[in-house]
From Swiss-Prot:
PROSITE patterns: RRM (PS50102). The modification Omega-N-methylarginine is found at residues 285, 385, 390. Residues 129-205 form the RRM domain. GO terms for molecular function: DNA-binding transcription factor binding; mRNA binding; RNA binding; transcription corepressor activity. Residues 24-36, 83-103 have a biased composition (Polar residues). The lineage of its organism: Eukaryota, Metazoa, Chordata, Craniata, Vertebrata. It comes from Bos taurus. InterPro entries: Fox-1_C_dom, FOX1_RRM, Nucleotide-bd_a/b_plait_sf, RBD_domain_sf, RBFOX1-3, RBFOX1-like, RRM_dom. Gene3D superfamilies: 3.30.70.330. This is RNA binding protein fox-1 homolog 2.
Length: 394
């Protein structure tokens, strides 16, 4: 007993909270407390001290732990500030660098675009351009048009379109510089020149259609087989798809028919002498062409075949070709021999002649009638072909 009392007197009482032993609160809280190791907070970056745990007031915390925490918090504050500043600086520096790079890239892009636009503008300015000028005065010629447009820039070419009657009222002007062409178009479009309001537009490329060319024949015709069979049946008597015509091959050409079959078509063209006999030609022109259209009407006529006696006394009553018949068939249809006089030829033709269809025409009182020269198929056709038409476009 005495020894224990001595120990009690020698040892100082434990200071609550000094050695890490928590004190009992006045209410008698018997909850177990955590050890000092568990109370030590790890290294954190928050600037404020840790909150109290398990109801322990902050003023009774462990002193060295508080010092360490204070140092840590102070250090953390310093580090946090420096880190934040450094982070902001570091975060700002890449953005600044990126911004500078972006600015430089944008400037470079703008420079490239401006350079490209300038090059395009220079190319467009140096490209020639063609203008279409319409409704110009009919008396205008190329020098007049060049003088009108020459004030706006250098002109490479001037062309006014003409036909057989004169100017068609429009033309083309080609400028060396497209900018000059645009300026001329803006200034001159809609202006009145000698009472005519001219129109200036950009010329467009003409659309060319591929027309199917008709093969010209030896006599220069370009008729279709249907029309040609009416006006020249001797040219279309044999088809390339039919059997061979049994005439001499002296005046025939080989044509490749269907399936590679060669067909000989006799080329009996009016006005050309052939070595074939006159009787053969007459038979060819008259024997197998009964019921077809009449033979060729034109200035050049074939050699007349021999008269074939048949149906004497028949008068030709075709009203469509009557004018040609009554107007003097001998002078119109057949080329008479040079040895015969005109009177003899007229008398012989009026006495008896054939049209190549097996019909003989003898003298007729209507033959004495001589209508005006303007009547007839050939004359009327010549009027329409060569005459003036007020429906011409220009």
């Amino acid at each position: 007993m005495g020894r224990l009392q001595m120990l009690k007197h020698k040892n100082e009482p434990l200071t609550p909270g000094y050695h890490g032993f928590p004190t009992r609160d006045s209410q008698g809280n018997q909850e177990p407390t955590t050890t000092p190791d568990a109370m030590v907070q790890p290294f954190t970056t928050i600037p404020f001290p840790p909150p109290p745990q398990n109801g322990i007031p902050t003023e009774y915390g462990v002193p060295h732990t508080q010092d360490y925490a204070g140092q840590t918090s102070e250090h953390n504050l310093t580090l946090y500030g420096s880190t934040q500043a450094h982070g902001e600086q570091s975060s700002n520096s890449p953005s600044t660098q990126n911004g500078s790079l972006t600015t430089e890239g944008g400037a470079q892009t703008d420079g490239q675009q401006s350079q490209t636009q300038s090059s395009e503008n220079s190319e467009s300015k140096s490209t020639p351009k063609r203008l279409h000028v319409s409704n110009i005065p009919f008396r205008f010629r190329d020098p007049d048009l060049r003088q009108m447009f020459g004030q706006f820039g250098k002109i490479l070419d001037v062309e006014i379109i003409f036909n057989e009657r004169g100017s068609k009222g429009f033309g083309f002007v080609t400028f060396e510089n497209s900018a000059d062409a645009d300026r001329a178009r803006e200034k001159l479009h809609g202006t009145v020149v000698e009472g005519r309001k001219i129109e200036v537009n950009n010329a467009t490329a003409r659309v060319m259609t591929n027309k199917k060319m008709v093969t010209p024949y030896a006599n220069g015709w370009k008729l279709s087989p249907v029309v040609g069979a009416v006006y020249g049946p001797e040219l279309y008597a044999a088809s390339s798809f039919q059997a061979d015509v049994s005439l001499g091959n002296d005046a025939a050409v080989p044509l490749s028919g269907r399936g590679g079959i060669n067909t000989y078509i006799p080329l009996i063209i009016p006005g050309f002498p052939y070595p074939t006999a006159a009787t053969t030609a007459a038979a060819f022109r008259g024997a197998h062409l009964r019921g077809r259209g009449r033979t060729v009407y034109g200035a050049v006529r074939a050699v007349p075949p021999a008269a074939i006696p048949a149906y004497p006394g028949v008068v030709y009553q075709d009203g469509f070709y009557g004018a040609d018949l009554y107007g003097g068939y001998a002078a119109y249809r057949y080329a008479q021999p040079a040895t015969a006089t005109a009177a003899t030829a007229a008398a012989a033709a009026a006495a008896a002649y054939s049209d190549g269809y097996g019909r003989v025409y003898t003298a007729d009182p209507y033959h004495a009638l001589a209508p005006a020269a303007s009547y007839g198929v050939g004359a009327v056709a010549s009027l329409y072909r060569g005459g003036y038409s007020r429906f011409a476009p220009y």
